[in-house]
Amino acid sequence: MSFADHSVIVVTPVYEDVEASSRLFLELSAQFAGRIFVVAVDDGSVKNPLDIDSLQQAGLEGVILQLRRNVGHQRAIAIGLGYVSERIESHQRVVVMDSDGEDLPVTIPELLQGLEQEQVDVVVAQRKSRVETLKFKLFYAIYKRFFSLMTGRAISFG
């Protein structure tokens, strides 16, 4: 099968976390079998770079885009989306997922269902809860309040 033969393309950034991304790949394979093509963007991992074996061992087709240096989570996603944009066909859908275990493959069908509505091009998930330390939650709440005071806008995600 080739890129065009898959109905769903998953773009995921990975940085020094082969273990978590391998779990994601296994979950994707179990849930979607041959319908998923993975574009994993290794964001400059030095100690433990991702390789194609991680996908193959999970029974998935895909590519690993190896970046020479760490460019950050958002830029790695943008690079993955750029790769997809040059190859995507009208029947395919793209899902962006973190590879750290926070985003669950079981939510993909619900997201894709949202794209079936007319005039909808993008569906965004809102995380119901984070798995973070109390210290992180406290400082993030302070940041969100400060952001709201300075801009007049609330951050409703994260």
Regions found by a protein language model. Give the residues of each.
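Cell-envelope/extracellular polymer assembly enzymes that use nucleotide-activated donors
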Residues: 7-9, 37
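Short beta-strand/loop segment that forms part of the nucleotide-sugar
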Residues: 35-45, 65-66
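A conserved acidic beta->alpha catalytic loop
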Residues: 42-52, 101-102
